[in-house]
């Protein structure tokens, strides 16, 4: 076999980019939800509509079913609900544990009674004015959509919490919250003072950690002549490119947008 060039991601290419184990993040999420609910607050979880939202729903449902989390309402905003309905229509593609629950026990986790659909502005306002709950809404980086509207409504109370479970891109509202900003400018005329609690959980990422990326390169046989790093912030691509070159003596490239590269 011949291996000439590898194109690989560098989302978590920084030297300290090794997220905690998935189980740790699951337990931390449930802990945050419990503590916030006990304070009579609300938990906003901005999610990616496809994939991440359904993962969080499965986690919450599991802990509710096992009596490790009280049966508080989990409000699922518009698009997330629609995408989840498509997931539910194709159970054959689920993880084996979920398939067994559906086919052997007639328990579809996505149809648990804790999940409530929010489909209108009026219903959203009722959620905001109502009691303790969890809210799943897009967009995951809080660049727009219902997650921003919920944030604006919930940000003025330290009883509430926002839990960031996705990557937050530079310049996004989510990244500013992640960085600890307490005065968030939403528009020319609107600035939000952040009083709610902000949590970042990295263990839900669908991307490989720095160690996993380095291990992948180590296992390549034969060694490629060239590795091109993409899908990451410029600093992450450069850091990973440098580390790979230093450890494996492979030519690495961290191209900028619109750069042209000759493969051979």
Where are the predicted features?
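Acidic/His-rich, metal-assisted hydrolase cores and their charged scaffolds
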Residues: 1-264
